[in-house]
């Protein structure tokens, strides 16, 4: 085996998130609510040398299959990521992330007076105001949000 090869166990069934920008893998896990609490085997490789990028992160989650809306939510955190669905050790489906028109349940609004931060139990929804940047706007209070400073829910 060559020194440059990465040794990571193959998964039989589940999801592989590849080409995550280096150092962002833990943010991806947090945004998707993947914490291992359900007993699934999770493999995380951070800052792996990559030919396409200088470094990338890889996440493998056994027995969990991301839905399309989960895949598209990754566009803010990991715009160049690919999501591979694995069945019986084989690639069954490959998806590229794409920024949706709205993003719900990932971020909390940064406005402390927003109804989503009250005792009302209302989930936050961010509308994509601009794909450049990108720029998000809270659906409830219209605050423009800086993606890099937002808290995950």
From Swiss-Prot:
Q: What does this protein do?
A: Involved in allosteric regulation of aspartate carbamoyltransferase.
Keyword annotations for this protein? Metal-binding, Pyrimidine biosynthesis, Zinc
Q: Which GO annotations describe the biological process of this protein?
A: 'de novo' pyrimidine nucleobase biosynthetic process; pyrimidine nucleotide biosynthetic process
The family line of this record is: Belongs to the PyrI family.
Its quaternary organisation is: Contains catalytic and regulatory chains.
Pfam families per UniProt = PyrI (PF01948), PyrI_C (PF02748)
Cofactor remark from the record: Binds 1 zinc ion per subunit.
Q: Which NCBIfam families does the UniProt entry name for this protein?
A: ATCase_reg
Q: Where does Zn(2+) bind?
A: 109, 114, 138, 141
**Which is one GO molecular function term here?**
metal ion binding
Gene Ontology annotations for the cellular component aspect, listed alphabetically: aspartate carbamoyltransferase complex
Needs which cofactor? Zn(2+)
According to UniProt, the name of this protein is Aspartate carbamoyltransferase regulatory chain
């Amino acid at each position: 085996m060559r020194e440059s090869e990465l040794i990571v166990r193959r998964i039989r069934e589940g999801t592989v998130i590849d080409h995550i920008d280096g150092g962002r893998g833990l943010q991806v896990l947090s945004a998707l609510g993947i914490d291992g609490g359900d007993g699934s085997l999770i493999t995380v490789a951070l800052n792996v040398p990559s030919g396409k990028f200088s470094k990338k992160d890889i996440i493998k989650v056994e027995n969990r299959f991301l839905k399309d809306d989960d895949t598209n939510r990754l566009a803010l955190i990991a715009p160049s990521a690919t999501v591979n669905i694995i069945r019986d050790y084989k690639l069954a489906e490959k998806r590229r992330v794409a920024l949706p028109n709205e993003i719900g349940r990932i971020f909390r609004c940064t406005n402390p007076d927003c109804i989503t931060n009250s005792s009302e139990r209302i989930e936050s929804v961010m509308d994509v105001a601009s794909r450049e940047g990108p720029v998000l706007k809270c659906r409830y209070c219209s605050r423009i949000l800086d993606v890099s400073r937002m808290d995950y829910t």
